């Protein structure tokens, strides 16, 4: 299925940043939608946002060809509330998520209300295939698992953050799932989510299904753990950079490269 772009929307925020890209099939059927959310990206850590020590050409392209929103507010600029607001269009506290959702009661600040209507539920009712690839962080158990909140397909991470981008563990636990089955994939999380997204897009295109894909990367959230070769490239380019900054730049540039691969698969 050949795809033509018809709309492009870019969103950015200091604590969480996202981009949405929509496309139409040649016969002008209902558009496919790709919504990308990244985690803990600083507002100034993109070259389109005037950063001088890094390059993010693929994200820049979305900003340049889409709608750029420079004056807006995040009601609660941390992980779970941002995701609840994005998926429902509501103030996060109104759907039960004023703060971060965690499994331990003494550190938990929310419960995603089962009655809240989500974007994938609405789109699914409109004939879309719906998928979440990447980070969920809106619940660990029923009735708040991705497949119960509007997603036909889930391939990703249930929890809040990874302690290691390669083992994908959080405090010793494994939260990587394919739908309701625990999995233990090998590889850097950013690259896994990209590969799974490209495969999903190709599959739905082949079957000519209109799809909504919500791609939620963990990057560039800590730990600062990009592939070593990406750190080496940054340090070779600018030997004066502090090690921590070089790692963050490498993690962001690696993320941008992978976003480019997903967008290319649409085109």
Show where each model-derived region lies.
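Formylglycine-dependent sulfatase
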Residues: 2-14, 18-267
């Amino acid at each position: 299925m050949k795809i033509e772009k018809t709309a492009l929307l870019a969103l950015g925020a200091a604590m969480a940043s996202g981009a949405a890209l929509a496309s139409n099939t040649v016969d002008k059927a209902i558009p496919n939608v790709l919504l990308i959310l990244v985690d803990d990206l600083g507002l100034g850590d993109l070259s389109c946002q005037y950063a001088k020590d890094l390059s993010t050409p693929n994200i820049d392209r979305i900003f340049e060809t889409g709608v750029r929103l420079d004056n807006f507010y995040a009601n609660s600029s941390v992980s779970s509330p941002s995701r609840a607001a994005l998926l429902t269009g509501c103030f996060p506290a109104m759907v039960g998520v004023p703060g971060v959702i965690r499994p331990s009661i003494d550190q938990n600040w929310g419960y995603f209300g089962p009655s809240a209507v989500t974007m994938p539920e609405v789109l699914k009712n409109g004939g879309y295939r719906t998928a979440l690839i990447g980070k969920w962080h809106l619940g660990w158990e029923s009735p708040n698992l991705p497949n119960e909140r509007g997603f036909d397909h889930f391939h990703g991470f249930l929890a809040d953050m990874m302690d290691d981008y390669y083992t994908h563990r959080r405090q010793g636990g494994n939260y990587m799932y394919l739908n309701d089955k625990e999995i233990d994939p090998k590889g850097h999380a950013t690259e896994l989510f990209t590969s799974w997204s490209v495969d999903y897009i190709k599959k739905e295109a082949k079957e000519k299904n209109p799809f909504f894909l919500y791609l939620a990367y963990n990057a560039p959230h800590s730990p600062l753990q990009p592939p070593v070769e990406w750190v080496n490239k940054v340090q070779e380019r600018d030997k004066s950079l502090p090690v921590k900054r070089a790692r963050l730049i490498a993690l962001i540039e690696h993320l941008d490269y992978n976003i480019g691969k997903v967008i290319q698969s649409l085109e």
